[in-house]
Amino acid sequence: MSSPEKVEPQRAILESFANPNPQRDYEIDMHCPEFTCLCPKTGQPDFADFRITYVADEKCIELKSLKIYMWSFRDRGAFHEAVTNQIMDDLIAVCDPRYMQVQGAFYVRGGITTTITVEHHKERSTEA
């Protein structure tokens, strides 16, 4: 099990492809309902439903690579907050979107559900 302080990224798994319509803003919504990682305190599995919504710039996320990337967390210990932010950071590094929201809705553990939502807005140039 990985150290709870750091989620080991599998960024190299992620792939992108050229956005077929970069001149237009359009929303891409991906749903990953079978996410699993390990609780860094107990080693027990944590299950989550991830929703990734973004507006692509020049690149889009390739779906098969996203699936394999999300599966790569199955044997990793990670706090909910850390893993959600790591997923956001890795996706931004791969596709540099105009906008992205990553939401991880973790299933009940000890009578408590946790939902972590992170957003990214790309800074646009103000030059004319």
Curated annotation (Swiss-Prot):
Active site as annotated: C39, D46
Organism superkingdom: Bacteria
Organism: Magnetococcus marinus (strain ATCC BAA-1437 / JCM 17883 / MC-1)
Protein name in the entry: NADPH-dependent 7-cyano-7-deazaguanine reductase
Residue numbers binding substrate: I61, E62, L63, H80, E81
EC class (word): oxidoreductase
Protein encoded by which gene: queF
Entries under Pfam families matching the protein: QueF
GO cellular component labels: cytoplasm
Molecular function terms from GO: preQ1 synthase activity
HAMAP family: QueF_type1
Assigned keywords, A-Z: Cytoplasm, NADP, Oxidoreductase, Queuosine biosynthesis
